[in-house]
Amino acid sequence: QTYKSYNTTLGLRGDINDDWSYDIYYQNSDVNYANEYRNDLSVIAINRAVNVVNVAGVPTCVAKLQGIDANCVPYNLFQGGLPGDAGIQGVIDGGQTAQDYLAKSTFINGDGKQKILSGYVAGDTGFTIPGAPSSVSLVIGFETKEFAADFRPDTATKMGDRSGSGGATLPIGGMYDVDEFFMEVGIPVTNDLSVDAGFRSAEYSTGSETDSTKIGAYWTVNDNVSLR
């Protein structure tokens, strides 16, 4: 197995004026993987290799005589080995030519991707509740995310030709994205009490939407006790 991971992150932040600032970033992540499966016997090759006839005293594959597979090598399932070895020793005893024909390397590759673009502006609204020590603060932002994954087995794996794989493994892939908007507000009430609230809305490319809200308060009872 081989995994390669790539990640790029770019960001920019600064002040718009004395009261407002901004922060924006972009992230691109990509994970590639390659899996190699060695020495699984080919189901197709086995079926052809055991279908043998005698041609002038020489065991010959029917597939070779019919022009289906010129590389077919006869395989004696009962040659060598011990009971219960599933004929593997027969492949080994058959020599390198039989091993190369019957035992295959197969591959499954794939990747996962993620892209995120996010940003917000934050600042002082200049609006103050009567009696409050400072003005109301506000954060407004957005986030857009894209996710994708791809699973790519080779032809032999898709056909179920790997005798040790338990059957065919089909390719699959997909992606979705989500666009989000959020807002948070901080409201000083007194020197000891402040209230905060937030809202976030998300829209998914799969057709669903979600909204969430929060509200909270922070109260400083004394120098040693605070409640939130």
Where are these regions (language model features)?
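Surface-exposed, low-complexity loop segments enriched in small/polar and acidic residues
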Residues: Q1-V178
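Residue-level signature of outer-membrane beta-barrel architecture
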Residues: L10, G14-I16, G123-F127, M183, ...
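Repeated loop/turn-to-beta-strand initiation elements of outer-membrane beta-barrel proteins
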Residues: D19-Y22, A149, D192-V195, N224-L227
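Sequence/structural signature of outer-membrane beta-barrel proteins
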Residues: V31-Y33, F147-A149, D192, R200-T206
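Feature captures outer-membrane beta-barrel proteins of Gram-negative bacteria and organelles
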Residues: I46, F181-I187, D211-N222, L227
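Short glycine/proline-enriched turns and hinge-like loops at secondary-structure junctions
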Residues: A132-S134, G207-T210
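Alpha-helix capping and helix-loop boundary segments enriched in small/acidic/polar residues
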Residues: G166-Y176, E184, A202-G207, G216
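Transmembrane beta-strand segments that form the barrel wall of outer-membrane beta-barrel proteins
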Residues: L193-S205, T213, A217, L227-R228
